[in-house]
UniProtKB/Swiss-Prot annotation:
This is Cysteine protease ATG4. Residues 475-491 have a biased composition (Acidic residues). Belongs to the peptidase C54 family. Residues 126-135 have a biased composition (Low complexity). It comes from Pyricularia oryzae (strain 70-15 / ATCC MYA-4617 / FGSC 8958) (Rice blast fungus). The keyword Protein transport applies. SUPFAM superfamilies: Cysteine proteinases. It catalyses: [protein]-C-terminal L-amino acid-glycyl-phosphatidylethanolamide + H2O = [protein]-C-terminal L-amino acid-glycine + a 1,2-diacyl-sn-glycero-3-phosphoethanolamine. GO terms for molecular function: cysteine-type endopeptidase activity; protein-phosphatidylethanolamide deconjugating activity. Induction: Expressed throughout growth and development.
Amino acid sequence: MDSAVAGAADIGRYGRRIVRMIWDPEPTNDPIANRPAWCLGYEYTLETNITSKTKGEDSKLSTATSSDQQRPPAQANKVPQMPSAQLPTEAAATALSGNTTPPTPEAALEPTKITSQPAAIDTPPDSVDSSFDSSMAYDDVPDDGGWPPAFLNDFESRIWMTYRSGFEPIPRSTDPTASSRMSFAMRLKTMADQQAGFTTDSGWGCMIRTGQSLLANSLLTCRLGRSWRRGQAPDEERKLLSLFADDPRAPYSIHNFVAHGAAKCGKYPGEWFGPSATARCIHALANATENSFRVYSTGDLPDVYEDSFMEVAKPDGKTFHPTLILISTRLGIDKINQVYWESLTATLQLPQSVGIAGGRPSSSHYFVGAQRSDEDQGSYLFYLDPHHTRPALPFHEDPQLYTPSDVDSCHTRRLRRLHIREMDPSMLIGFLILDEENWHAWKSSVKHVQGKSIITVSEHDPSKGSASGRPSAIDEVETLSDDDGDTVLDG
């Protein structure tokens, strides 16, 4: 019997690998078109020069690259836009100008201050089977697919949080209605043992994992700089990863996300999280943990209010703290309305971008890059997929105890992408504002971005009684509520 089961598992594994090759092949770059590939505000083409060492060692930009080939949009003196779009006003372009030389690895170790760079609607569906992705999606070392090596190095340096298994049990809720809030597949999985807690988040934790990814990369930029690449400052990277260990002692562990979700967001253990609940957890956990890092969340509206933002970023009226802006929104009913394609793509081209969590039917991904499509007016968005179950990331009081395999499990060089028309409209968008100059550049960017705006910045928060607000705000972008039943975002 055991051999039969093992044989069936092998057949299933290889069968799924074949399906992956047919239906979800590794994306390749067109060297003739050589369209720029973007990763969180940095632009890459095949002309981008880079000196690559072996994996795990430093990857350093050549001097030819630093000035004009690998650059955030601000360094090109232009507002991020799609190639067919018209340029915005000269004032907006000027507002985005900044230093053209990326920090050296040594400078990246200093407290980061970068002036030109950084920083619902959910109904539990049947869970997406994580084994489809986890058995094959990232096991093989991919070739470069014609992509700029500097782009792949940047992509690989983004922190990637995934499903984990074998961690300390997360107790089940004693509320009799808790099981009804889970997806049907999760109810089947947990039916056999109603008493045991959750030792894996496979099938329900993908939105939490993409939220962790967004937060981790924000902290990475604050601590090590946007130009940090794998192999640089390994001790600092281990310290950062320890904050996200799968253990209640780690401040950003899945245990603490679930605990806050249960206490403040009405989310039971084992229940999927939506973008709004994830934003509230990030806000609470980060503000309780970090001394010089703040989180500003817009709630369920796309409006950013300058007076409220400054109360978070500069509470004493003098010292500006790096601040993560979280915007939970919905840009359509079943699919993203095409009027938002340009502006949503441009958010990933902004130098303050720290990515998008959510945004795929029946699952959540962490989107970090974009490339214009050759076939139409849309774009392909590059993402990190959390649906890949790995052993739990342990907690160590001494981060030096993390092994290379522990660190490697939080990175991947394998690209995944989807067309923007395939995205789910429910998402969490993040921007990291490092200082006041960065804040003013970001305001100008979102004001002049191409396409229908998905973000509005106003001076005063009407809830404070200092202004009447914008009556049209509610009509401009559909809002997000975790209790709305139109959109499926599952783990």
